[in-house]
């Protein structure tokens, strides 16, 4: 994997609060190698290590994108939902930003069936066929469509398992992480000071609560994906 320059600087990360961890009572001892200090009862993440792992993650997604790889971004915190959707759409990635439905990946055949149903209902709505049904039947199908849009809208074009998952909160998205471990799908994970870095294939030590921190990390990864996709077009 070729190393590239991704304009990752420590000052920018400090301004975004990437270095702020959780209180010292709420920590995972396995995070010790990534913790720089304890300030007023708060663990401070070592940003030099964050920068190194983030650069590695950018290299990884660039290479995968240049080969046509598919990415799934997972971040279901309410305050991050819009950010996740915008970033994923920009980089032509799939995303889950509401609730992770158990078995979404490990029971892919069921997910695929739901996606087919979702596409059929969207087609019926676009062609006006839903409005020609009896009101009761139309109302039931519209509710189904709304439900599917909420939970599967970000993966509606996904035709198979993704090549890499980008997980923005290890604790919040633990079910998704376990499914990836079961299936052997590589994961890039933001890990705060209360997380287990050993569960992620490529952990990025960072504040996973502050929107500025999440935005900075996600924007770097999305930029690398976009660059990788452009590279594949320039060098087919």
From Swiss-Prot:
GO terms for biological process: translation. Keywords: Chloroplast, Plastid, Ribonucleoprotein, Ribosomal protein. GO terms for molecular function: structural constituent of ribosome. Its main location: plastid. InterPro entries: Ribosomal_uS2, Ribosomal_uS2_bac/mit/plastid, Ribosomal_uS2_CS, Ribosomal_uS2_flav_dom_sf. It is found in: Plastid, Chloroplast. It holds the Pfam family Ribosomal_S2. One of its GO terms (cellular component) is chloroplast. It comes from the Eukaryota. The keyword Cytoplasm does not apply. NCBIfam families: rpsB_bact (TIGR01011). Belongs to the universal ribosomal protein uS2 family. This is Small ribosomal subunit protein uS2c.
């Amino acid at each position: 994997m070729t190393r590239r320059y991704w304009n990752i600087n420590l000052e920018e990360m400090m301004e975004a609060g990437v270095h702020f961890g959780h209180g010292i009572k709420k920590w995972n001892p396995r995070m010790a190698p990534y913790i720089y200090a304890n300030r007023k009862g708060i663990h401070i993440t070592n940003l030099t290590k964050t920068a190194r792992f983030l650069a590695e993650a950018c290299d990884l997604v660039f290479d995968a994108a240049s080969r046509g790889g598919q990415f799934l971004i997972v971040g279901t915190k309410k305050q991050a939902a819009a950010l996740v959707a915008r970033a994923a759409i920009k980089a032509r990635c799939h995303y889950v930003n509401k609730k992770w439905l158990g078995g979404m990946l490990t029971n892919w055949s069921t997910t695929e069936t739901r996606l087919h149903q979702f596409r059929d209902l969207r087609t019926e709505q676009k062609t006006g066929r839903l409005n020609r049904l009896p009101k009761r039947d139309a109302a039931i199908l519209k509710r189904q469509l709304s439900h599917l849009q909420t939970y599967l809208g970000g993966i509606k074009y996904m035709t198979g398992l993704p090549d890499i998952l980008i997980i923005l909160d290890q604790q919040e998205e633990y079910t998704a992480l376990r499914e990836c471990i079961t299936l052997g799908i590589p994961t890039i994970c933001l890990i705060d000071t209360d997380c287990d870095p050993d569960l992620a294939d490529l952990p990025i030590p960072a504040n996973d609560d502050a929107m500025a921190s999440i935005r900075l990390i996600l924007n770097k990864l999305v930029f690398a994906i976009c660059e990788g996709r452009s590279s594949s077009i320039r060098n087919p």
